[in-house]
Amino acid sequence: MPQTDAVDHVHRLLSCRLPARLRQCVVAVILCGLGPLAVQAQSGAGVSNPLSAVRASGGQLPSLGDNSALAAAAERRLGDRIAREIYRDPDYLDDAVLLEYVDRVWQPLLAASKARSEMSPEIEQRFAWEIMLGRDRTINAFALPGGYFGLHLGLIGVVSNRDELASVLAHEMSHVTQRHISRLISKQSEQTPWLIGAMILGVLAAGKNPEAANAVLAGGQAVAIQSQLNFSRDMEREADRVGFGVMTQGGFAPQGFVSMFDKLQQASRLNDNGSFPYLRSHPLTSERIADVQARQPPGPVVTLETTLEHAMVSARARVLSNSGADALRQYVAEASDPALASATPARQASVLYGAVLASEKTRDFAAARTLLARLDGLTRSTPQAQRLTNLLGAELALASGQPTPVLAAPGRPELLLSAQILTGQGRAAEASQALLSWVATHPRDASAWQLLAAASSAQGQLLRAIRADAEARVAQMDYAGALDRFKAGQTMVRNAGNAGVDHIEASIIDTRARAVQLLFREQSLER
């Protein structure tokens, strides 16, 4: 097999279609990172030279077939390293509306998995259980080490209801709770030190020169592990079985699993053109399809309807993942189709929502307001859909510079939008107060910290703005960047002397700088 094919096969380990630079780094981290991580986990000490650590361990990674299985703590550290790369990627998206909708599907699945004892207490506590959105229109979702999960907007855009989305998320969650990724990684215990060394060099090269990284990875003879990295058929069937149980116990309709399989099967029959990478990493087999169909409860087949809310969320995902000029014009044109009047309410809501958002993106605010009025009339009697209409209206008003009332609902989307509105209206103190209350209980919300930095700066509170900027970086595990900002705050305090210094804020910065310094040292030792 050509070396390039082998590298592509390695990429499919994580069922992930990432940008080339990030994909090379992630692959290298997966294939070599566990050498030093495993040594570190066993010794309790950091490892300053990963290549030396691999040589000291005989070049072997742990095997889950025996007692040297990859520890949950080591897997979480590996997941953190990958997540840090994803946070920095331009395709990473923190969209409050989409994330909230996905989280309302995700949380019942987590609760059901715990209730069924599918996850051990150790991984329940140690793993992140975090979903990260990718601005990619391909249909894909993937599990990463340490309880991180990726979800492409393309998948949100094609599922017809929350039950289909739940089936995919439950399947991916089950790959993690059943330790499939850990088992796959740990199979590589027989690789030679020179191969693992080449992969380590690939990590270093990926940060500076993607082409060099690709050459190093190919030169490392990745073909040696080609046949060992796919999820096995048994793993796929196990993820189906466990995921089905988690999904149904979580309150979702079992028909969602079947209808999602039908979508994937149709795509497979149509000779997938690359927009369904999920099919390549999770190939459908007749056994998988028959097994899921056999799990359906007896009785008539239930047809799952698309709610207005889901239709609007899917439309948002489609527009945000495909915002080229031609695509935006097409979204707007669909709203002018006379046949739309006879379509289902869900179809109308989807088209109108997408058209409003597309018009906003093209800065045709007059057209956007006209379309928004049509959407408002359609959704007024459905509270959840009306809420999405109100949020979209606030986004439009903010983008067009129109005065808009502050949103009062208590959700994260309202909070983040209201903070921007208040700051823009010269009411930054109110925005700061709301954001401070939020980050006190949600310290890993990088977007909230960034808005707090903007609100603090608008009030002339530069020291608080610097700290908020630093905390945003901490939330995404960019400890080097955070430490740089904390040090900038300390320098500001020293230069100001006692004149106008917020001593409480200065004390907080000193404390946080020391804590982040330790995190930065630990992070450096893992490289």
Predicted regions and their residues:
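Hydrophobic or amphipathic, alpha-helical segments that drive membrane association/targeting
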Residues: P2-T4, I30-F142, A267-R269, F365-R369, ...
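Membrane-active amphipathic alpha-helices enriched in small hydrophobic residues
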Residues: P193-K208, A215-A224
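Short alpha-helical catalytic segment bearing the HExxH-like zincin motif
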Residues: G150, E164-E172, V176, A218
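Short pre-active-site segment immediately N-terminal to the catalytic Zn-binding motif
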Residues: A71, G150-S167, F231-D234
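TPR/TPR-like alpha-solenoid repeats
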Residues: F149, V158, V176, G299, ...
